[in-house]
């Protein structure tokens, strides 16, 4: 993930096709020792591909992934009068989960 993040930073910064040394340079600025084999694999996989198209395709794939929230909402709706209270509780629970999962237990460049 850290190699991909460095690659994306370089492309956003204006490099159309970042080299292995460019990626190593970005990673070294935050104290990460880069593995050249992984960098070469990343570059080979992304060579000649449009980053924006890859991101769009990834978003489409993520949109098809089912989430756990839909299953808990169905029984609440069937309960009739309890639905508004259940919706509020679900919103509060979702808000708490968002706050607790901000870094999801790992850093971007760890």
Swiss-Prot record:
Signal peptide: none annotated. Pfam families: Ribosomal_60s. One of its GO terms (biological process) is cytoplasmic translational elongation. The modification Phosphoserine is found at residue 100. Keywords: Cytoplasm, Phosphoprotein, Ribonucleoprotein, Ribosomal protein. Residues 76-110 are annotated as: Disordered. GO terms for cellular component: cytosol; cytosolic large ribosomal subunit; RNA polymerase I complex. Residues 95-104 have a biased composition (Acidic residues). It is found in: Cytoplasm. Residues 76-87 have a biased composition (Low complexity). InterPro entries: P1/P2_N_sf, Ribosomal_P1/P2, Ribosomal_P1/P2_euk, Ribosomal_P2. GO terms for molecular function: structural constituent of ribosome. Disulfide bonds: none annotated. The keyword Cytoplasm applies. Component of the large ribosomal subunit (LSU). Mature yeast ribosomes consist of a small (40S) and a large (60S) subunit. The 40S small subunit contains 1 molecule of ribosomal RNA (18S rRNA) and at least 33 different proteins. The large 60S subunit contains 3 rRNA molecules (25S, 5.8S and 5S rRNA) and at least 46 different proteins. The acidic ribosomal P-proteins form the stalk structure of the 60S subunit. They are organized as a pentameric complex in which uL10/P0 interacts with 2 heterodimers of P1 and P2 proteins. Yeasts contain 4 individual small ribosomal A proteins (RPA) which can be classified into two couples of similar but not identical sequences. Each couple is distinctly related to one of the two A proteins present in multicellular organisms. Rpa3 and rpa4 are essential for cell survival, whereas rpa1 and rpa2 are not. Belongs to the eukaryotic ribosomal protein P1/P2 family. Component of the ribosome, a large ribonucleoprotein complex responsible for the synthesis of proteins in the cell. The small ribosomal subunit (SSU) binds messenger RNAs (mRNAs) and translates the encoded message by selecting cognate aminoacyl-transfer RNA (tRNA) molecules. The large subunit (LSU) contains the ribosomal catalytic site termed the peptidyl transferase center (PTC), which catalyzes the formation of peptide bonds, thereby polymerizing the amino acids delivered by tRNAs into a polypeptide chain. This is Large ribosomal subunit protein P2A. It comes from Schizosaccharomyces pombe (strain 972 / ATCC 24843).
């Amino acid at each position: 993930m850290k190699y991909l993040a460095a690659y994306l930073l370089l492309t956003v910064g204006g490099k159309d096709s970042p080299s292995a040394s460019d990626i190593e340079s970005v990673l070294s600025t935050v104290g990460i020792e880069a593995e050249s084999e992984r960098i070469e694999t990343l570059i080979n996989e992304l060579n000649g591909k449009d980053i924006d198209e890859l991101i769009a395709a990834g978003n489409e794939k993520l949109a098809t992934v089912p989430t756990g929230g839909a299953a808990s909402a169905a029984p609440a709706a069937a309960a009739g009068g309890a639905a508004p209270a259940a919706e509020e509780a679900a919103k509060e629970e979702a808000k708490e989960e968002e706050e607790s999962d901000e870094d999801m237990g790992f850093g971007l460049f760890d």
